[in-house]
Structures are given as C-alpha cells and as structure tokens.
Amino acid sequence: MRLTKKTVFIGIASLLILGLAAWGVNVFLVMNNAQKSFDKNFIHFQAKSDDNETFITQGIGKKEAYNLSYSPAKKTIEISKSTKNGDIYSSDSIYGAVKVYDIKQNANRYVFITAAKPIIVDFGITSVKVTYDGGHFETPYSELHFGETFPSEDN
C-alpha cells in the first residue's frame, strides 16, 4: 500500500477527531463527577446537629480561598473568604448567613433562593462559578473540595 497525501491527511484528521472526542468525554466526566459530588455532599447532606457543610474550598496553599457553607439544620447558607497571612488564617463572612427557602436545579446550574438575593452555582467546562449579590468567585475543578464538615460557630 502506498502512502499518499490524501491517506496521511485522513489519518491525521482521524487522530485529531479521536483526540478531541477523548478530551470532550474527559471534560464531561470531570464536570459530571463534580456535580454529582455537589448534589450528594451538599444538597442532600445530612449533618449531625448544627454542623456546617463546606462545598467549595480552594487550595490550602492559596493566600485567599472562598468557601460556600451550608447548615442543613438551620437552613442557612454563607459565603466566606479565608486569607492567609504567614502561618495565620483569618476568615470573614462576605455573604450571609442567610436563610435558604428553596433550591432550583437546571442542568448544570443550581440557584439557592434565599432571604436576600439568590446564590447561583454554575458548573462550567473547567470550573465552578458562584455568583452572589456583590460579586462572584470561580474555582477550577482541580482545586475543588467537597464534604468537609466543621462545627458551626454558634455551638
């Protein structure tokens, strides 16, 4: 069999299409796994007493990290920002804690209907974006952590 330009072109195009398909499947699986974990560990989390459930935390080594926390017992949601200064971490609430009245889901988007303005969680191709009144933050899937419980400060 003789290799012609047409045969080589078809071979390269086939490999390119297979590579793109594999990349697309990988992106879908990462996003789908993150969304399933969010649903299991956050939306349907069953906390003991007044424990809060943290959904998004960015890498521990970062100077700033954003957290979306939920207290199933109190039905409240809060967004906080942790800042690292040397070896010391400080955390400030930047939104909440506000009462959650309902959670709406539409494909890759969750909308938390709260006593204030809604909080929107969008699962994108490479990251999760949380939008709230006054701002937003985005976390790549590689820095995303789920299901971290900690006692509420009110206990």
Where are the regions a protein language model picked out?
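Short, Lys/Arg-rich N-terminal segment immediately upstream of the first membrane anchor
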Residues: M1-K5
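Prokaryotic Sec-type signal peptides and long signal-anchor helices
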Residues: A13, N32, F42, Q46-S49, ...
